[in-house]
Amino acid sequence: LGDVYKRQKYTNKDWFVGAKSVLGSNLTQASGLGGFGVKSVNERTGEQKYTPIRFSSSWLNVVYGQKWKPGVFVGYAKNLGTSDELYAPDGKAQLYGTGTNLDQLVTAGAELTYNVPHWKFGLEYTLSSAWYGSLNTSSGKIKDTHAVCNNRIVAVAMFMF
């Protein structure tokens, strides 16, 4: 299966709505989550064959207004495991990539910006929760997860010319 993505955007005088969904394998080449793992090793030559880690992610962003612009953002990413069983003769599989021990990630945020000619002032709060765990070598999925949360507040003053 190749990478599949869908992006939608709607704008008018008062509204901006944007959304994107991606389903793919080894999305690290596009700065995404994923990678690959060793699925077999030729015992005579040491040659390795690989299987990709599949990820799905989606997000939605909605902003309303002209001078005062409140907005919300939500996002979700899920590790779908590997296409094939991983090679793990000693119980430890070899994985290469980004977020290889991440099961899922949820992000939600709210923002408020004040916009006048050449200036934008804003405040944003974002909560992100990531579930990390250990690897199931038969499916490449993550099991025995625990959540880690992050709170972020960002203030901005931007001059546009």
Report residues per predicted region.
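Short, small-residue-biased leader/transition segments that mark boundaries at the very start
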Residues: 1-5
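Residues on the lipid-exposed face of transmembrane beta-strands in outer-membrane beta-barrel proteins
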Residues: 6-10, 58-64, 110-114, 123-125, ...
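Oxyanion-binding "anion nests"
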Residues: 9-35, 40, 64
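Short sequence motifs at beta-strands and strand-loop junctions characteristic
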Residues: 11, 50-55, 100-104, 113-115, ...
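Outer-envelope beta-barrel architecture signal
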Residues: 13-17, 56, 66-70, 117-119, ...
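Transmembrane beta-barrel strands of outer-membrane/channel proteins
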Residues: 19-25, 72-78, 108-110, 123-127, ...
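Outer-membrane beta-barrel "beta-signal"
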Residues: 147-161
